[in-house]
Amino acid sequence: VRLATELGFEIEEKTKEARAQKISLSSLVQILKGNEIYFISKINYNLYKTDLNLSFREQISKEPLAEKGEFEIILGNAPDQITVLSSKKNLYLLNKNSRIFELLSPGVSQARFSADGKKLMFFSDHEIWILYLEDFLIQPNKKTGEKELITRFAQKISDVIFFPDDEHLAFVVGDKIKTTELDGRDRRNTIDFLTAPFPQIYFDGEKEIFYFLTEEKLFSLKLKK
């Protein structure tokens, strides 16, 4: 029974790989979210969605992307939160009403949605920005679609992530891990959190643990509420 179970699992995994390979032959990029696969077609540069069984094929974008090349698909927790980052560093956001990809910003290194789905963070080599995805009626008030410059540095910014509270950011500048708040009233507080050679950072939101990797060594810190 165990052998049959293991064999069945192996066949299932190989079947999934074969299906993913079938999609990859006709797509530029693909990303798996749950049991759904999002991919950009090589033929028409539109975004599509299917499942692991390839039982359906749904066109997400109404019009093709404005440029050709390689892309990265970035998804939020909500079904309509989709951005695409091109190899030319152009960030496109899918308009959930028109279903058309609109250029949000050029020169973008990376982008991430907040866990609560209310914000999109994107950064370049020297700037960090926030796009608000819904109205904020409490202070500080924000409107849907409003963009805000959070910080700017002369040194290169290599990575940025949300804190689990979605109200603070951690980011890497040189060998320093810094933190900053999104609330820009009065004076925005930005502090040096840690110093480490070429650090890479990650938050486990559920366990509220901050990880950073430096010189092939992984460290963790438990966040206090």
Regions found by a protein language model. Give the residues of each.
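Blade-level signature of beta-propeller repeat domains, shared across WD40, Kelch, NHL, RCC1
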Residues: 198-225
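Repeated scaffold domains used in trafficking and secretory/extracellular systems
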Residues: 23-35, 66-76, 106-118, 154-161, ...
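Surface-exposed loop/turn elements that mediate protein-protein interactions on large endomembrane-trafficking
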Residues: 4-23, 44-65, 87-104, 129-150, ...
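Extracytoplasmic beta-rich ectodomain segments of secreted or membrane-anchored proteins
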Residues: 72, 79, 85-89, 100-126
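Loop/turn-rich, solvent-exposed surfaces of beta-rich toroidal or solenoidal domains
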Residues: 152-179
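Charged, low-complexity helical/coil segments in non-catalytic cytosolic or luminal regions
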Residues: 123, 143-146, 152-153, 164
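Residue-level marker for isolated small/hydroxyl-bearing positions within beta-strands
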Residues: 4, 40-41, 84-85, 123, ...
